[in-house]
Amino acid sequence: MLKLIVPTIMLLPLTWLSKKHMIWINTTTHSLIISIIPLLFFNQINNNLFSCSPTFSSDPLTTPLLMLTTWLLPLTIMASQRHLSSEPLSRKKLYLSMLISLQISLIMTFTATELIMFYIFFETTLIPTLAIITRWGNQPERLNAGTYFLFYTLVGSLPLLIALIYTHNTLGSLNILLLTLTAQELSNSWANNLMWLAYTMAFMVKMPLYGLHLWLPKAHVEAPIAGSMVLAAVLLKLGGYGMMRLTLILNPLTKHMAYPFLVLSLWGMIMTSSICLRQTDLKSLIAYSSISHMALVVTAILIQTPWSFTGAVILMIAHGLTSSLLFCLANSNYERTHSRIMILSQGLQTLLPLMAFWWLLASLANLALPPTINLLGELSVLVTTFSWSNITLLLTGLNMLVTALYSLYMFTTTQWGSLTHHINNMKPSFTRENTLMFMHLSPILLLSLNPDIITGFSS
């Protein structure tokens, strides 16, 4: 794993030693080269020592998430150039250092084999994210958003730490591989039920589950473009990854405890989708759509079948790329109109036809149109929820309908209609922006040709 961690750490001195005119080129190209390294981990069936050590290791669940994390760093750097154009050089370097340190902590979180190390790095991701939101956000409300983000995450994570200490005192080890192989069947007692809640609550806040989601729209809306992209694409996936790892160890207790959370996530999925139909703020709409998609992932994980895990992993990767793409498009609108209100940016199709094309593709990917990878993820989850209970088909089917409605509502409101009077001159779409959209969309479309590489555990 050091072949991935060390080059990423070396991006920090590269950033600070780069000249003013080379800082963007150096960081983008080197981070793009680093994003190729996780592809080597797909060979681990024949060569297991390739990516395994006592401290860090990768498996078919970790590797797709590592790919997503490393692929996203060059994209966030490309997306932030306009946002940072008026900042002094030292602040640009500090901003890039925050993004790189966030990537380092994410890689270590996904690959940690000890649960206490996983917890430490899980919490470490909070620091650079909080700095990015509260320092580089656009509006004064960013401080309020940062407070929500901090307290929700910390309060949710404290029971996890207590549960980990209790488990270590009881079993003498917190190694994920050992715990998975030697897991005892937990009885359905009050103490074990509370321990299950303590283990999963941190991840349900992070996902977030409906009811624990109030921090997410605020954080998304107030964060700068890189903050929104990383938050939507990778940080929410930490919750899904942690739940997948720990619910397997806590079986068969998960099967007893899952029912209220399954109902809550299915209900929350429809509620948040419906909220999207009433949004006027573009970033807020995309944030609520993230909650809706992640509710489907929570449902899949709690059903605890190999197929549902496959659907959850595919959906996490697909949602990471799609939501990041939507935030990039929303940011391109914001940089030109200086407003997140959708009605004020209507009719942009006449001025920016190529950007309208990216908007159309992003909206169609969001509603899971073939041949995107989103469709495969949603169908896998749909089939597993239906086999678990027939009634869920009504809820998941209704959710797909509402998702299609708000995706088309978002596209038509921003692209069609007559131009508003305050838009009198507008810069055309830049090559950088078009490259950015292409680099988001190409994996969404290409992964559908060979989805085996991101099917997680079942591979």
Curated annotation (Swiss-Prot):
GO molecular function, one term: ubiquinone binding
Disulfide bonds: none
Reaction(s) catalysed (UniProt annotation): a ubiquinone + NADH + 5 H(+)(in) = a ubiquinol + NAD(+) + 4 H(+)(out)
Alphabetical UniProt keywords: Disease variant, Dystonia, Electron transport, Leber hereditary optic neuropathy, MELAS syndrome, Membrane, Mitochondrion, Mitochondrion inner membrane, NAD, Primary mitochondrial disease, Respiratory chain, Translocase, Transmembrane, Transmembrane helix, Transport, Ubiquinone
Transmembrane segment boundaries: 22-42, 60-80, 102-122, 145-165, 196-216, 224-244, 257-277, 284-303, 308-330, 351-371, 391-411
GO biological process, one term: response to hypoxia
The organism's place on the tree of life at top rank: Eukaryota
EC identifiers of the protein: 7.1.1.2
Localization per record: Mitochondrion inner membrane
Topological category with respect to the lipid bilayer: Multi-pass membrane protein
Enzyme class: translocase
GO cellular component terms attached to this protein's record: mitochondrial inner membrane; mitochondrion; respiratory chain complex I
Disease per record: Leber hereditary optic neuropathy: A maternally inherited form of Leber hereditary optic neuropathy, a mitochondrial disease resulting in bilateral painless loss of central vision due to selective degeneration of the retinal ganglion cells and their axons. The disorder shows incomplete penetrance and male predominance. Cardiac conduction defects and neurological defects have also been described in some LHON patients. LHON results from primary mitochondrial DNA mutations affecting the respiratory chain complexes. Leber hereditary optic neuropathy with dystonia: A form of Leber hereditary optic neuropathy, a mitochondrial disease resulting in bilateral painless loss of central vision due to selective degeneration of the retinal ganglion cells and their axons. The disorder shows incomplete penetrance and male predominance. LDYT is characterized by the association of optic atrophy and central vision loss with dystonia.
Family to which the UniProt record says this protein belongs: Belongs to the complex I subunit 4 family.
Assembly information from the UniProt record: Core subunit of respiratory chain NADH dehydrogenase (Complex I) which is composed of 45 different subunits.
Function, as annotated: Core subunit of the mitochondrial membrane respiratory chain NADH dehydrogenase (Complex I) which catalyzes electron transfer from NADH through the respiratory chain, using ubiquinone as an electron acceptor. Essential for the catalytic activity and assembly of complex I.
Protein name (database record): NADH-ubiquinone oxidoreductase chain 4
Organism this protein belongs to: Homo sapiens (Human)
